[in-house]
Amino acid sequence: MATSSAVLFFLLAVFAAGASAATFRITNNCGFTVWPAGIPVGGGFQLNSKQSSNINVPAGTSAGRIWGRTGCSFNNGRGSCATGDCAGALSCTLSGQPATLAEYTIGGSQDFYDISVIDGYNLAMDFSCSTGVALKCRDANCPDAYHHPNDVATHACNGNSNYQITFCP
């Protein structure tokens, strides 16, 4: 019995060492409040001007999105936003338009990330990986972003990296 418990503990330790969460630091440099939203991780929250907050995203998360909502008013988790609204919910389960999107997949040994304005543009954004290229999007024509589904704008990053998203850099 003790041997099987030791083997189980060892296997769990090896698995946990190979799978690590990524930390996304979200900073609002805008002169107004932004309500960041994220799917499938992050939900939604208020981020006042000059504030930052962290979101931990587990390894294996694919097709993730984080965006900033503007002009929002909420009461008990329900309300609306002028841009990036997600069906009137504070905690989002889908993305709304228009919204500048930070998109990501957190893999094992390699992650992928990009900025997309396919669903519209609403906020200037920087999106960077601690071991990769810094992406910048200052307007709807930003060259670092996806504008059409067939564009090639995805970047790779080493696994176990952390990320920075800055609104109004």
From Swiss-Prot:
InterPro entries attached to this UniProt entry: Osmotin/thaumatin-like_sf, Thaumatin, Thaumatin_CS
Entries under Gene3D superfamilies matching the protein: Thaumatin (2.60.110.10)
Key words, A-Z: Antimicrobial, Fungicide, Pathogenesis-related protein, Plant defense, Signal
Signal peptide: 1-21
Keyword Signal belongs to the record: yes
Main function: Associated with resistance against stem rust fungi.
The protein's name: Thaumatin-like pathogenesis-related protein 2
GO biological process, one term: defense response to fungus
Cysteine pairs bridged by disulfides in the record: none
Pfam families: Thaumatin (PF00314)
The organism of origin for this protein: Avena sativa
CDD domains: TLP-P (cd09217)
Family the UniProt entry places it in: Belongs to the thaumatin family.
Database matches in PANTHER family: OS03G0233200 PROTEIN (PTHR31048)
Superkingdom: Eukaryota
UniProt keyword 4Fe-4S present: no
